[in-house]
């Protein structure tokens, strides 16, 4: 069971190449700030625009630099089942604690296809698997029945839910059970998610505010929701501003502002507008980050 806030790590680039020095330093910054776990090469890590070799390298660097201080849930999803199996097995071989596998995007499988996809990955790997349900990006939305069926497969352990439907926390608990690991994939609704019984979150905001996010989550995990709400109030402007333009553009800008890495993105993502930069600056000041 994974609990706490896991950072959906940015992937630093420099002059078109992965910046390993900045990545290792950034991982240290996250761990030293109290973050509970790390998630390399998910959407926030620009997984669609890294090569296979870079994808695998990012996972290897993260596992090596974390050095078992915190768990690593490696992003290994693909809309090609065979590719997802390959990436999942690589993460397992290198020592990841689990794999985060997004629902297939663009080819839009139905519920039977979703079940077959995850079943094949699980049966061909030995690592715990988290389903990543994000219909806003993948178009498909895994329903409760399919998720319940998949949980019967021994190494499928839970979900990162980025649907913003808070009622699903209760539905999953009541139908699938308390042992189904539920992590929020939406920073702005994490407080409500936790009050409904969630176990933690995979966060974008924690890239730039790991201490605030980990303090917030520690309060949630101990049931101190009134105190957690005060920190959430500081973070809410950030939660909103970091998605004013396609992510991770705004959060990479903020990371550069803090001296953590370059804001360099890979096409088709482009530099954010001045208006968005101003909004992010304002939110960072409100959270006392700058």
Which residue ranges define each predicted feature?
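Active-site beta->alpha loop and helix N-cap motifs at the rims of alpha/beta catalytic domains
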Residues: 1-7, 11-141
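C-terminal alpha-helical cap/extension of soluble enzyme domains
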Residues: 4-12, 29, 33-35, 44, ...
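Residue-level signature of catalytic and energy-coupling elements of molecular machines
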Residues: 17, 159, 280
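A general structural signal for well-ordered alpha-helical segments in protein cores
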Residues: 23, 55, 59, 84, ...
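Alpha-helical structural signal in soluble globular domains
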Residues: 33, 57, 61-66, 90, ...
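Short secondary-structure transition/capping segments
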Residues: 50-53, 86, 111-114, 142-144, ...
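Catalytic alpha/beta core domains of metabolic enzymes, predominantly
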Residues: 123, 137-243
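Glycine-rich phosphate-binding "P-loop"
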Residues: 133, 155-156, 266-267
């Amino acid at each position: 069971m994974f609990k706490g806030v896991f950072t959906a790590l940015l992937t630093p680039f420099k002059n078109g190449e992965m910046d390993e020095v900045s990545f290792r330093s950034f991982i240290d910054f996250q761990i030293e700030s109290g973050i509970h776990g790390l998630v390399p090469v998910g959407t926030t890590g620009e997984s669609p625009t890294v090569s296979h070799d870079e994808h695998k390298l990012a996972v290897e660097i993260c596992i090596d630099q974390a050095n078992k201080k915190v768990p690593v849930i490696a992003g290994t999803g693909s809309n090609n089942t065979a590719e997802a199996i390959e990436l999942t097995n690589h993460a397992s071989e290198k020592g990841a604690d689990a794999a985060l596998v997004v629902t297939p995007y663009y080819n839009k499988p139905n519920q039977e296809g979703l079940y077959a996809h995850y079943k094949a990955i699980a049966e061909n790997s030995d690592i715990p698997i988290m389903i990543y349900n994000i219909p806003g990006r993948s178009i498909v939305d895994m329903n409760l029945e399919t998720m319940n069926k998949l949980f019967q497969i021994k190494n499928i352990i839970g979900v990162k839910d980025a649907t913003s439907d808070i009622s699903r926390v209760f539905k999953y608990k009541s139908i699938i059970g308390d042992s189904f690991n539920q992590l929020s994939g939406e920073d702005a609704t994490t407080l409500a998610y936790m009050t409904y019984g969630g176990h933690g979150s995979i966060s974008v905001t924690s890239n730039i505010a790991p201490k605030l996010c980990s303090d917030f989550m520690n309060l949630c995990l101990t049931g101190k929701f009134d105190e957690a709400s005060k920190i959430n109030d500081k973070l809410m402007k950030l939660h909103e501003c970091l998605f004013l333009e396609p992510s991770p553009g705004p959060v990479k800008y903020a990371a550069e502002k803090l001296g953590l890495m370059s804001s360099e993105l890979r096409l088709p993502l482009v530099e954010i507008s001045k208006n968005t930069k101003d909004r992010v600056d304002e939110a960072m000041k409100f959270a006392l980050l700058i």
